[in-house]
């Protein structure tokens, strides 16, 4: 399907390669916790070589953000990001760092080689307005902002995913806060 979409349009096409890697692993073994980091990077490179223009990659979920989430406690909306859920399950079971964060130079090398825009996913976005801009989400934004700066210094274009569910009166102040924290990195909502 992806190849046919790429052939049918001149528009920039984006993917979330973690989904393909996770689903393929689940089909083979029955669980995302069996996913191999090398397989995830193979999927990323394969999609980049096919001509994907941007990829949503969840680098901001790491041991630090998961510890922040744990200390914070209950979230009304839980963890609503599919990519965030896959990575959290994988990290907790395997007691390992997120390979997308841990092997950041490898990821950036692929993005640069194929001129793919790195879209930093928000795996801890709020699933309910009650959780908007909570500590875990802010911690992920800090990590994503650091990754964005690191990638840009290495010649990779980036965008950062927006906030998730917030009340309408929080949008402007939230956007200003995120722009300030990320050194004015481009966001999309």
Language-model-derived ranges and their functions:
Residues 1-178, 182-189:
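Alpha/beta enzyme core
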């Amino acid at each position: 399907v992806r190849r046919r979409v790429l052939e049918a349009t001149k528009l920039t096409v984006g993917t979330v390669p973690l989904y393909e890697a996770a689903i393929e692993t689940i089909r083979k073994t029955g669980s995302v916790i069996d996913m191999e980091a090398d397989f995830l990077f193979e999927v990323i490179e394969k999609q980049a070589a096919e001509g994907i223009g941007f990829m949503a990659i969840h680098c901001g979920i790491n041991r630090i953000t998961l510890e922040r989430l744990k200390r914070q406690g209950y979230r009304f909306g839980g963890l609503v990001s599919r990519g965030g859920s896959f990575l959290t399950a994988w990290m907790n079971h395997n007691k390992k760092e997120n390979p997308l964060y841990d092997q950041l130079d490898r990821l950036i090398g692929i993005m640069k080689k194929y001129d793919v825009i790195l879209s930093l996913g928000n795996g801890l976005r709020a699933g309910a307005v009650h959780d908007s801009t909570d500590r875990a989400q802010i911690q992920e934004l800090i990590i994503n902002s650091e990754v964005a700066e690191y990638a840009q210094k290495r010649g990779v274009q980036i965008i950062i995913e927006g906030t998730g569910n917030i009340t309408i009166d929080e949008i402007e102040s939230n956007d200003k806060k995120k722009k300030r924290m990320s050194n004015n990195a481009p966001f999309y909502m």
